[in-house]
Amino acid sequence: MVGLGVFARKFFGSAHERRLKVLRKKAEQINVLEEQFQKLSDTQLCKKTDEFRKRLVEGETVDLLLPEAFATVREAAKRVYDMRPFDVQLIGGMVLHDCGIAEMRTGEGKTLMATLPIYLNALEGKGVHVVTVNDYLANRDAETMGKIFGFLGLTTGVILHDLDSDARRAAYACDITYATNNELGFDYLRDNMAFDRSQMVQRGHHYAIVDEVDSILIDEARTPLIISGPLEDRTDFYNLIDTFIPALTPEDYEIDEKQKTTTFTEVGTEKIEKMLEQAGHLKGESLYDIENVAIVHHINNALKAHKLFVRDKDYIVRNGEIVIIDEFTGRMMPGRRYSEGLHQALEAKEHVAIQPENQTLASITFQNYFRMYRKLSGMTGTAITEAEEFSNIYGLDVIEVPTNLPIQRRDEDDEIYRTAEEKYRAIVRDIRQAHEKRQPILVGTTSIEKSEQLAERLRKEGITNFRVLNARYHEQEAYIIAQAGVPGAVTIATNMAGRGTDIQLGGNIEMRIRQELQDMPEGLERTAKIEEIKKDVKQLKEKALAAGGLYVIATERHESRRIDNQLRGRSGRQGDPGRSKFFLSLQDDLMRIFGSNRMDGMLQKLGLKENEAIIHPWINKAIEKAQKKVEARNFEIRKNLLKYDDVMNDQRKVIFEQRMEIMNAEDLTEMILEMRNEVVEDLVETYIPSGTYCEKWDITALQEELHQLFNLELPIETWAKEDGIAEEQILERISNAVTKLENERIERFSPEVMAYFHKAVLLETIDTLWREHLVHLDHLRSVVGFRGYAQRDPLNEYKTESFELFQAMLRNLRRIVTSKLMRFEIIQQPIEPRIPEQTDVGDPILNDQNKKNSSTLWTPSQENKFVNPKDRNPSDSTTWGKVGRNERCPCGSEKKYKHCHGAFV
């Protein structure tokens, strides 16, 4: 059978080859249209957009429009930028349109390629999201590619970190929106915490193209997006615990670098117990008594912070704050914080201000966020090694798009040394040799610390003309990358994965124009200078080519082969020559943690001397085996995370859909009535179980519950003494009494007031209980793994118990909402004749009547002066001034003020 399979592949081609053959035929159809579209005027070409939209309305599909739409974009790109998408870019665009992942080598024009499917799918008017890894790339691509879309009559928006809600809403309303994965995810979570539909910014999830798709959907898949709020301040306790760790010795704890965990030994536990006892914080006799659970958590975090997390590798200290470094891209991630007290432990370790711990308010993983899109696709330079994961988790096929020109880069064999010192001596020697012939060099390191150590070595060797690109200097990233291809340039970079910028030999013309001519106005002089820059870059490129092209030197193998391939792929863009080489040592993290312990002995037996390298197929296979082992482990972690998050995701969908229904509903009376009836039925069933005798009824408890929930005093004891009374009759009487009380409240407060309160109480209660539920799920997730020791499947246990917690939350929701709506009171504040002082009371706060003060709804006070209606902001009541009771409400509801916002004043 194997022989037949091999024969079939040779005869018919692989599935990948057959797919490319079909796509090439489609590309030919587009090429046939090129001459026809060249003859169109700019106006005629622009009108194609309206023509395509009309045809879609009449029933045509985007698939049928593809050849003409792609031909339109190709012609627009030629006219706007004098850039013509190659056939391979047409193929890549079709892969993206068909919900696939296009693997294209660095420098092959992914950004321009993406304009083809973006335009085609934007014609439907449902929004296209283009996802990038950072704000710089989102802004750059929106600005440059937006000119092509603008030429064709489409609107382009960009979401940046510091935009307010109105600007975000406007950007999402555009035909095409560029944004980072983080901003998209957080906007989705914030939308599902909004009080009103008008506060939401996104408009759905129709089609997304993810740039650097492997970085976002693979590398970052393990990290959930979390919106959190502060808990109590425990600064002193964190500082105290932090003082314990330096007193420990290596025999007091164990570190598993492979699993990234730390544990105390028996000796270490005894030491910690003594220190806690002296500080007066040990409860009970043992550290592991139930009363000390929180303390154990803090101590484990402190140990992890000191022994597992390395400054300038995992994080940096910047402006008195701990800033996390992305392990895959080497970029800083400002605003991101480790959860569960780990970030506070790092702050205590580095003696910076400790921020309060946070409580999760809402969370989602990128895996579940991006699976919400009706159409999803991606592009990257390296995806084949992760093809199985893309297919299993996202249902995306990876297609390797051919290069426009053959690759001329020479990938040399790895050089393996016994020690890191020998390795770095060899790297410096190689850099010197290449630098002397003016070959541009890119050196890839795995951490800030190692990049700066290498920089210091180069200085000592007299090589000073180099640049360092790491998280410390990320603001200069674009410029450093742009100049990395200049002859004689030496660039030391931390993790080139996901940089999104290719290195052009001779330098980047656009960057030089921006840098050198930023203050020069348009005119003949500027045009002449631009021509000079172009000529200079051309000459520099010729020199770089003569020196052998870009030389990529890697100082370590990464855990993932894909990251190594990304670094290699920086050389040899668009058919340019180049070379790459990896320098390794047995002291590298990958070799030390995952490699074979016998490798060092084997090298010694082979007679390896100091400063000698070994190049052997057996060594290369061992390295690849170690990398595959790590990749498999990380894949399992991500799959496992998804299984657990899928459980929460099902519950999240229910809650978010319920919130959306409440926000959109004009009348929630039926929902409230249904909740109230279920609460009454549950109460009666609990204290007067069906089919039981009166002697078994707990009348006292039922009366207490009715008083607590509804503020009702009913003669249930008297009813229970009636001859032949049944639980159904008592249920009916209680229901009638509750309905009567509710009707009285409606008469007192008007339907508008009740509608507002129904919505406010429902949303506020759902949000509060959902936050608490997330905490419960976090706790359950952290301990459920131990069920495996009892021969029970942790995942099944998690599913069962999380469902029970969810059902309990829904029951609690019904009780709390019913109780609040049956007990609230409004205190009307009389308007004094004098102009009151301005008071910023904030958002409405609903207090429970059982508290010291009676229940009160507060709203921002209105300043007692008249304001021109044109100057009033409908969404900001503080700008309305004095509003007449019979005027139309400034909010835009078309109701009279006294029946709308004026009802609360």
Swiss-Prot record:
Q: How is the cofactor bound?
A: May bind 1 zinc ion per subunit.
Q: What is the lineage of its organism?
A: Bacteria, Pseudomonadati, Pseudomonadota, Alphaproteobacteria, Hyphomicrobiales
Q: Does the keyword Protein biosynthesis apply?
A: no
PANTHER family the record matches: CHLOROPLAST PROTEIN-TRANSPORTING ATPASE (PTHR30612:SF0), SECA INNER MEMBRANE COMPONENT OF SEC PROTEIN SECRETION SYSTEM (PTHR30612)
Instruction: Look up the EC number in the record and give it.
Output: 7.4.2.8
**Protein name per Swiss-Prot or TrEMBL:** Protein translocase subunit SecA
As recorded in Swiss-Prot or TrEMBL, the protein's gene is named secA
Return the PROSITE patterns for the record: SECA, SECA_MOTOR_DEAD
Question: Gene3D superfamilies from the entry?
Answer: 3.10.450.50, Helical scaffold and wing domains of SecA, P-loop containing nucleotide triphosphate hydrolases, SecA, preprotein cross-linking domain
Q: Which cofactor does it need?
A: Zn(2+)
> Which Gene Ontology biological process is one annotated for this entry?
intracellular protein transmembrane transport
